[in-house]
């Protein structure tokens, strides 16, 4: 068994500090958030999509620390109507595209469905 965590739980750390910390703790797998409800503190989604060298550097740093990616996460509300939903759908599409580019087979997401207009929904 390998122990993992989502990187948002150490969101105040830089990417390099995150890697040092989790390696010191014996954590071997990380789930990186690409956006939506997360601020994505450790994954520059657009930069990674646009730059093969950025992807290679990211993966090399993980490898140098003995860490692999368990999943990318894009939890949000892509079913929300209007601009919020469109923004979340865009991040979802980009996260899935990045997963393909870096060989990650798992993308974590959740959907939120409004039961009725009186029910408040989380938005971000």
Please provide the spans of the model-predicted regions.
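Active-site acidic/histidine proton-transfer and metal-coordination neighborhood
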Residues: 17, 55-57, 61-64, 78-124
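N-terminal glycine-rich cofactor-binding segment that shapes the pocket for flavin-like pterin cofactors
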Residues: 67-69
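Active-site beta-loop-alpha junctions enriched in small/polar residues
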Residues: 6-10, 33-37, 74-77, 112-114
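Conserved beta-strand positions in the central sheet of alpha/beta enzyme cores
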Residues: 31, 71-73, 108
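Glycine-rich, positively charged N-terminal anion/phosphate-binding segment
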Residues: 33, 41-63
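Catalytic domains of carbohydrate-active enzymes, especially glycoside hydrolases
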Residues: 16-38, 98-106
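Extreme N-terminal starter segment of soluble prokaryotic enzymes
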Residues: 1-4
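Residues that form or flank phosphate/diphosphate-binding pockets in enzymes
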Residues: 13
């Amino acid at each position: 068994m390998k122990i993992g965590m989502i990187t948002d739980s150490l969101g105040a750390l830089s990417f390099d500090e995150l890697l040092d910390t989790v390696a010191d703790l014996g954590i071997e797998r990380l789930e990186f958030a690409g956006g939506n409800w997360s601020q994505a503190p450790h994954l520059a989604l657009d930069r990674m999509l646009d730059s093969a060298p950025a992807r290679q550097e990211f993966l090399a740093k993980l490898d140098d620390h003995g860490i692999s990616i368990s999943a990318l996460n894009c939890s949000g509300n892509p079913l929300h109507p209007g601009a919020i939903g469109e923004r979340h759908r865009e991040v979802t599409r980009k996260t899935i595209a990045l997963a393909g580019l870096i060989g990650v087979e798992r993308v974590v997401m959740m959907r939120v469905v409004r039961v009725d207009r009186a029910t408040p929904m989380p938005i971000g």
